[in-house]
Amino acid sequence: MSFLQLFIVSIVQGFAELLPVSSSAHVIMAEKLMGLDPTSPELTMLLVMLHTGTMFAVIVYFWKSWRATYFSSAPAFRSNAWLLVAATALTGIVGFGLLKGITHFMRKTAPGFEIEHLFGNAKLMAGALAAAGVLIIVSSRQQARQHGTLSVGKAMVIGAVQGLCLPFRGFSRSGATISAGIAMGVPQRRAEEFSFALAVVLTPAVLVKEGWRFYQAVANGSLGHLEHGNSLAHLLAPSLLGMLLSFLAGLLALRWLSRWLEQGRWHFFGAYCLAASLVVLAVG
């Protein structure tokens, strides 16, 4: 991978991961346009580091707000921790249930099927982008009626919606969870904070999963160039640079997202997702 390719993938990941436009769809399409294989183990380590960069961007950006909301007192911490636990539990039940169900169903006709085989499917990505766009636009009409609180029930709904995003590249996690909160009357700032708190809880599990996939690729000899004398440092150096780039891009993306939420421009992201779905169909 050239420096230009690394730069493009890192910036796309940093912005799209934290904007409600689906980072996976954008990164996969960018990799395809540049002739890179989005399912190759070689890119797995880079993507792990890019996700790490955006996770740190979320922590840095929201830390002051979370400290006032989540860590202001012991009761506040317990209450918010319970909301996160309830939402994450539903994410696991719905998300991993879907992953297992889809894999089981597809293996009836394709014995060697793995869920990763769906990730590069342009039609599925386009459909998921369109669905996310519609959800964002519909929820934007509720922005003027946000007087509710974030209850355990609402947190569980948000967690379930997050679970629906796991198998489908193009269905923006942040877009879906923030939209779900807004649609249920949760104040937009609270919905945004909770959505990204959920991301920080979920991201380490994703990193472990992708890291294990990379380890298996090395152990199985899928990364042949590592067996011919090159060390992991050959991949680590560009991955660390990518992590820094995605961190900086992520901070800019979060500021952009917060401003548009405050200014009532949430629906613009939905319109973008609808347009992007058409582009994915045309290019894919």
What spans do the regions from the language model cover?
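Multi-pass membrane proteins that catalyze or facilitate reactions on polyprenyl-/lipid-phosphate substrates
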Residues: 1-284
